A protein has these predicted regions:
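Aromatic- and charge-enriched surface segment that lines or borders ligand/interaction sites
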Residues: 95-139, 288
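Alpha-helical secondary-structure segments
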Residues: 48, 123-130, 160-164, 198-199, ...
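Structural transition elements
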Residues: 5, 317-333
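Short, low-complexity disordered leader/linker segments with a strong preference
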Residues: 1-46, 61, 88, 133, ...
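Ligand-site clamp/hinge motif
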Residues: 217-261
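N-terminal lobe/hinge region of extracytoplasmic solute-binding protein
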Residues: 50-101, 132, 195
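Surface-exposed binding/hinge segments that line
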Residues: 98, 102, 143-186
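Gly/Pro-rich hinge or "lid" segments in bacterial periplasmic/extracellular proteins
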Residues: 85-88, 167, 171-228, 236-238
Length: 333
């Protein structure tokens, strides 16, 4: 039986590690060569991804708050721009954009022929609606639906393919907020049956069981390799391990090294850093931590590598701040 396409993220930085894997089974994951080993990707097939939480949050991309739900919806929705694998903002629903000399007006040119999953073509009106919706302050609240949009002064459709977004003052981080999902202006069921422009379209959600999506054939960009992805809801990480070994799921993330060690030898495990920092924060206003020498003594006394060896089999990176190593731009001069 083929050795299945495998695993994904690892987790970590300071103290805990996360490992994922994928085991034998009958479904073809569509991402391995003819010999069953990882190689040139092959279009088609399906996978089942195990997750240790129910997606019981709203599926509306502007209202969901759970990180796990956002990870899934990232496949369904896109903004005017989106991050690439290096974290750089690249065009998505927008083909390009320009920034005014004073840094307060972003002018986006929409990509030709981008379609929503319901078959409608994305228009400037949809973009204006989406951004205004994020910037609006819901009744009874003090902040916009999306807090980062509090700086938006106006959103205007200059023509059928051009939208101008003006903010109160220059903010070089604002372009990253334009990853907010573009949604149809006339669609009202986002919370339960989401419609976006991403490479996968929503199929179904069964509470406490699964979330299913399939490749969107009219996607504007490179088509997804897989025909179908099912997220299977598991009770906890131990249940993920059991389902992996049993063959009912093909892939998962966020296991500890101890849990990963329970996987059989047919699994391939990949690991890498993510945005998780485990730290002890001290109250500098309380004695004896108001003394800098005491704080320094604690730092010197703690065996950080020993902690990582004990709880994470040596995985992780000792850091000197709450900024995780993968956030490389922070460390640029």
């Amino acid at each position: 039986m083929k050795k299945k396409l495998l695993a994904l993220f690892l987790a970590l930085v300071m103290v805990g590690a996360v490992l994922p894997g994928c085991g034998d089974g009958s479904k073809d994951p569509g991402g391995q060569g003819n010999n069953g080993e990882t190689g040139e990707p092959v279009k088609g097939g399906e996978i089942t991804v195990g997750i240790a939480q129910d997606l019981d949050d709203s599926l509306d991309p502007h209202q969901t708050v759970a990180a796990g739900t956002r990870e899934v919806l990232f496949n369904i929705f896109e903004g005017l721009v989106k991050p690439n694998s290096d974290g750089e903002m690249i065009p998505a629903v927008a083909e390009k954009y320009t920034l005014s000399e004073d840094g307060t007006t972003y002018t986006f040119t929409l990509r030709e022929g981008v379609k929503f999953h319901n078959g409608q073509t994305v228009t400037a009106e949809d973009v204006v609606y989406s951004i205004n919706r994020c910037a609006a302050v819901p009744e009874g609240q003090e902040k916009p639906l999306v807090a980062a949009f509090s700086a938006v002064k106006s959103v205007e459709a200059l023509d059928e393919k051009t939208v101008a977004v003006t903010i109160a003052q220059r903010d070089l981080e604002f372009i990253s907020y334009m990853t907010a999902a573009i949604i149809p202006a006339d669609y009202e069921n986002q919370a339960t049956a989401p419609v976006g422009t991403g490479p996968f379209r929503f199929v179904s959600r069964t509470p406490q069981q699964d979330f299913v999506m399939e490749r969107f054939e009219d996607y504007w960009g490179a088509p997804a390799w897989l025909d179908k992805v099912t997220y299977k809801i598991c009770e906890n990480a131990d249940a993920l391990v059991m389902n992996l070994n049993g063959g009912s799921i093909d892939l998962c993330a966020h296991l500890t090294s101890a849990q990963a060690s329970q996987l059989n030898q047919s699994f391939q495990v990949l690991e890498g850093t993510m945005n998780l920092v485990q730290a002890i924060y001290l109250n500098n206003q309380a004695k004896p931590f108001d003394n800098q020498l005491v704080r320094q003594a604690l730092c010197y006394a703690i065996d950080r590598q020993g902690i990582m060896d004990m709880v994470a089999d040596g995985h992780g990176t000792a850091v000197g701040s709450s900024i995780y190593p993968a956030f490389t731009k922070y460390f640029l001069p």
